[in-house]
């Protein structure tokens, strides 16, 4: 007797499973890796991506992957690990994608030959544990160095980060600016939110300035603003989250009165309410008033007559930074406004920078902060420069916290690769092959840097393997030197340094991503569920909502 067909999934559902599915996922990841591969290293190329948000020029792995509309579910894993690397460390986003792709490429041969994915996963996790141990053993501590040596180390780490960016030609100028900005912060917290980057179109890149305090662009102002003072020493600062303007009547508003004098009393009461608010602010002793909400022309003129500076519609992020830097507390009412909630700074002034005017709060006593005002020509250039500086700031912060560095340019990857190969000889079974594959995958970093710089990567890798095989304290620091004729150099002596946390995070994230993709053996997709849904509350034929909509349209005369 024939067994009836049992349908478990909706009609049209696509299911893929088994070895073919794993291979398909690996191929999808490989195609994404090929896109970002050419952006790695000091000679990496940029990508021009045009989408709904306009044209974007970038060579930052996380930015590129975020702008690409990737639909393959397995390939989206790369976007996640690049974003995690960017959020956690700030740099190494392309490296982590390349490493994950290479680990999957190496595992593809094992899967095709019949090795179980869990054996590959186990081998990769064991290799990762060894790699992190070797990473610690081959790092250099700077905790016992002098302040001058530490600062030099921070400058070199910032320059290494900027080497592969659009600002590579100005790395000395911007690395000094970045280190100064991070040094301004409280050394115990190193809160990145207290460093702001403001972009001003026009002028040269070298016209960029560092403000040791908070700076933001002058907001929209009403008549009377010109009469307000633009410079204060040790001012009292009041932060508000209330409107200080007369509200217009709402459309179709209705007031029922028996006597025309009643209307005058209503208007007078409204004026009295706003004047009462303004009086309380003045009585508190505030000399600078900032609000997230509008400050109207009446309030602007009132403050100008009393030598008080005011600015409304200030961005929430800028208010937050001013609050942290000056010690002010944002108020949602002016009732009970006292000296306790007012902040202060050493100097406040409004300055012209390029075509814009900026409000500068300097010498802030409570929480030290800094603002980089970035200049440049094209908007796309400034936007990419801002992303580059963000990466460098994150790197310097991490360096100050970790106090350990490793040589860059693929040097540490080659040394760990050599040590893993030696260790694999002592390992039994199939795991030995997987550890060897992990060691080979690490070589993708120096290989790609050499390729992107125009060197013969095969020759460069052979020379580097020979150097690292000498097992000396100097030879282990050899990596790709794009300026050398033979393509190799001692990257520790060449000051190509990276914080250990960048490599540690990259190895861990790439391995986790590879293991996650290898553990997926089935994908279930329902094309119908991916179709755009009708907006909620739409017209439904014969339904109550549909009738209500028709009735409303009839009232409006549609």
UniProtKB/Swiss-Prot annotation:
The protein, known as: T-complex protein 1 subunit eta
Ranges annotated as spanning the membrane: none
Complex and partners: Heterooligomeric complex of about 850 to 900 kDa that forms two stacked rings, 12 to 16 nm in diameter.
InterPro entries: Chap_CCT_eta (IPR012720), Chaperone_TCP-1 (IPR017998), Chaperonin_TCP-1_CS (IPR002194), Cpn60/GroEL/TCP-1 (IPR002423), GroEL-like_apical_dom_sf (IPR027409), GROEL-like_equatorial_sf (IPR027413), TCP-1-like_intermed_sf (IPR027410), TCP-1_chaperonin (IPR053374)
Lineage: Eukaryota, Sar, Alveolata, Ciliophora, Intramacronucleata
PANTHER family on file: CHAPERONIN (PTHR11353)
Family listed: Belongs to the TCP-1 chaperonin family.
Task performed by this protein: Molecular chaperone; assists the folding of proteins upon ATP hydrolysis. Known to play a role, in vitro, in the folding of actin and tubulin.
Source organism superkingdom: Eukaryota
One Pfam family it belongs to: Cpn60_TCP1
Keywords attached to this entry: ATP-binding, Chaperone, Cytoplasm, Nucleotide-binding
NCBIfam families: chap_CCT_eta (TIGR02345), thermosome_alpha (NF041082), thermosome_beta (NF041083)
Residues covered by region (Disordered): 524-558
Gene Ontology terms: cellular component: chaperonin-containing T-complex
